Regions:
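Loop-helix junctions at membrane interfaces
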Residues: 1-176
Length: 176
């Protein structure tokens, strides 16, 4: 009766798994507040390591749990920086869904690496496309100004962010 009321992905979880997932959510939430500027001259582009935890949750428990970790960890930021939080959630979720889909086909290190490689490309593409909508709202920039930021700032930032999260998650996965 209680299991029927649980959201998708939680029904068959043991209490130990649920506790581990909650700890992953809390860890990601704390790490989401560690924000480091990466691109000189574009201080609003900040890296945070919470995506690492979301990727590990995806590899360990599946895509929907990874999405839950990513979204839940950024809820506090929706109040202070709704556009930045939205962008971070979308970038992380696009990475997670690709990694989870590839890894689920054959759960092994090679598929985790392949999923991360494809996820970096997809996440970067999604982020660049969304930047053409969100950056004008965030900074009052024109389409041309956003386009001029793609190569020197937006593309490197998004690739570095997704790649860093992927590399650390894969190294951590190997230790598990």
């Amino acid at each position: 009766m209680v299991a029927e009321s649980l959201p998708y992905g939680w029904q068959e979880r043991s209490p130990k798994q649920v506790a581990a997932i909650v700890l992953l959510i809390l860890m990601a939430m704390v790490l989401s507040f560690v924000e480091l500027p990466v691109v000189p001259g574009a201080e609003w582009l900040k890296y945070d390591p919470s995506g690492i935890v979301s990727l590990l949750a995806t590899i360990l428990y599946g895509s929907w749990i990874g999405v839950a970790v990513a979204v839940t960890s950024w809820i506090p930021h929706l109040v202070t920086d709704p556009l930045g939080a939205f962008m971070n959630i979308m970038a992380t979720v696009s990475l997670i869904l690709v990694v989870g889909t590839v890894y689920r086909r054959k759960p092994c290190l090679m598929h985790a690496v392949l999923g991360c490689a494809a996820g970096v490309v997809v996440s970067s593409a999604v982020s660049i496309c969304l930047n053409f909508v969100v950056t004008p709202l965030y900074m009052g920039a024109t389409y041309e100004q956003v386009a001029s930021l793609v190569l020197p700032a937006l593309l490197p930032f998004n690739v570095v962010k997704a790649l860093a999260n992927s590399v650390v998650a894969i190294v951590s996965y190997r230790k598990l």
